[in-house]
Amino acid sequence: MRKNSNMSKILPPIYIAGPTASGKSALAVKLASKFDSVIISADSMQIYRTLDIGTAKEDISIREKIPHKLIDVVDPNEEFSVAEFARLAKTEIENAQNSGKLPIIVGGTGLYFEALLYPMSFANTNKNDVLRESLQQELQNFGAHAMHQKLQSLDPQTANRLHENDTKRVIRALEIVLSTGKTLEQNQDERQKPDVIMVALNTDRDVLYERINKRVDKMFDEGLVQEVLSVGDFSYQSMQAIGYKEFANCNFSVENGKYVVGDAELDQIKDKIKQHSRNYAKRQLTWFRKYDFVKWFDINDVDGAIEYISQKIAEKTALQ
């Protein structure tokens, strides 16, 4: 791997986004082969230890060659917030820059990018401790479903992105809309555009959906059933994710130390995961398309993306 030519330069963070199965990680790895880099995951599921197959973590052999951060941070029974991600990611970005390395932030979790691209507004937007306490009390009295329905009536776009059991983010979204009278997106539209290098990958819908379907098939071939059912407690935040929550009510047995699900039910679960993944890809595209500072590339134009990023890095470091 070639070292960066000028170690005194502070290399700018590179942001790589896009829908699931679009090849984001592969682009990050290829970029890291050109620059001495640290890859920082912006994926809300890859932070969980042992959840490897359903979260499509990069192969361990690659992670041993190229430093990967914010993967395997907490156990599946632990919760992890956007604020925690932002704090850890900021530290990893600074550590990489102080070591003369290129920080590459890659993933598909929109709120994680939001926290890094708009740190001040994300952290400080209309915090209201009294309102938050009131909302927390409502949560205790009426439950997660009722709070999610409340958000659905006030800010349906944000509600559609959040699972009802993701109560921290539901409460935060309610706090913002009730404090400002504006939806999360309306608040975001008023912010100043960040001066960052960010690319995103996409392709024709049919091609993307086929890639998603093949990825899901591969996950099952690699042992997704065993991974999910070995955790088993679907009350965990980690188990609310696509690829895991679909197993919540399945019937299974244990044979020779392995979890076994009937073929017909397994096919239904697999189809649900594919459908949910395709729907998630639509939501990801909607999220990242609202960033008008993003440069989009087709998934087959990885070289073009790397050339663009390299040019932007040269422009930014030339000003130092």
Where are these regions (language model features)?
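Phosphate/pyrophosphate-binding catalytic cores of soluble transferases and nucleic-acid-acting enzymes
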Residues: 2-320
